[in-house]
Amino acid sequence: MLNEIKLSLQYILPKQWLTRLAGWGASKRAGWLTKLVIDLFVKYYKVNMSEAQKPDTASYRTFNEFFVRPLRDEVRPLNTDPNVLAMPADGVISQLGRIEGDKILQAKGHNYSLEALLAGNYLMADLFRNGTFATTYLSPRDYHRVHMPCNGILREMIYVPGDLFSVNHLTAQNVPNLFARNERVICLFDTEFGPMAQILVGATIVGSIETVWAGTITPPREGIIKRWTYPAGESDGAVALLKGQEMGRFKLGSTVINLFAPGKVELVEHLQSLSVTRLGEPLAVSVEAVAADVAPAVISQEEADAEREANPLVDNDQNR
């Protein structure tokens, strides 16, 4: 009965308004009130502040500053094996495994469309059909910066407006096509392991999604798909990120979905649904040995041009 009420509220509550309100409040400097809210949050969610660079809650001027708090370097050592892809975030594995054609597992008995997740971009979807995916849920207590699993050259970013359903075990089991319905930012990279997509999925009270190269992507929420393209490696203006480097963050939290091309990587065997993830630990292993100094493979210009022609979204300059 309680779960039915919670699910009904997902469709009734004004999620966009609540999200704007939460984002507004989280960005305000309110002195003792800010500290009180942070202290209550830490206590309720059992946040481990000893891992933070600034463990004293009084050192945060806003709730957002606290929420995206950086960790001390030594608490999340990075696996430096060039054949290992690292966890992009702290959290819990929601689902992972093989992409069956166009179908990605959302929860037991529930699939959603790869192409729908990628905003109907069928050429991008073709890169990942029958590939591998991993969905990581970031709970309120977790570190909310997202990092690179491997070295990568950014080739494309797409902002997809959408719903703002809460993302949790209950909604994953009961809201059809949850991740393909919610607001999200899709980032496509060239890597040593072929193309990789890292998708930041929004949710109720996720005030903003940011990337390190473009800053705040949302808000504003204008209701239109936006697309940015970026040059290949070695080109002027290329955005190159290293394994373990921060690539984005949530204010407040949600979900990261990673997509890998078929035949390129194998997920670490012990990982399963509800496995706890820690940034920098092994997520997957290359099918073929990769030398440490190999440059990321790139999507050809012909493929990139064909994709742009097939998906005439709202294009923006990368220097936005």
Curated annotation (Swiss-Prot):
InterPro entries: PS_Dcarbxylase, PSD-B, PSD_type1_pro. The record marks 253-254 as: Cleavage (non-hydrolytic). Residues 301-320 are annotated as: Disordered. GO terms for cellular component: plasma membrane. The active site is at residues 90, 147, 254. Its main location: membrane. It is a peripheral membrane protein. The modification Pyruvic acid (Ser) is found at residue 254. It is an enzyme of class 4 (lyase). Its cofactor is pyruvate. Binds 1 pyruvoyl group covalently per subunit. Pathway: Phospholipid metabolism; phosphatidylethanolamine biosynthesis; phosphatidylethanolamine from CDP-diacylglycerol: step 2/2. Is synthesized initially as an inactive proenzyme. Formation of the active enzyme involves a self-maturation process in which the active site pyruvoyl group is generated from an internal serine residue via an autocatalytic post-translational modification. Two non-identical subunits are generated from the proenzyme in this reaction, and the pyruvate is formed at the N-terminus of the alpha chain, which is derived from the carboxyl end of the proenzyme. Keywords: Cell membrane, Decarboxylase, Lipid biosynthesis, Lipid metabolism, Lyase, Membrane, Phospholipid biosynthesis, Phospholipid metabolism, Pyruvate, Zymogen. GO terms for biological process: phosphatidylethanolamine biosynthetic process. Coiled coil: none annotated. It catalyses: a 1,2-diacyl-sn-glycero-3-phospho-L-serine + H(+) = a 1,2-diacyl-sn-glycero-3-phosphoethanolamine + CO2. Belongs to the phosphatidylserine decarboxylase family. PSD-B subfamily. Prokaryotic type I sub-subfamily. HAMAP family: PS_decarb_PSD_B_type1. Heterodimer of a large membrane-associated beta subunit and a small pyruvoyl-containing alpha subunit. Catalyzes the formation of phosphatidylethanolamine (PtdEtn) from phosphatidylserine (PtdSer). This is Phosphatidylserine decarboxylase proenzyme. It comes from Cronobacter sakazakii (strain ATCC BAA-894) (Enterobacter sakazakii).
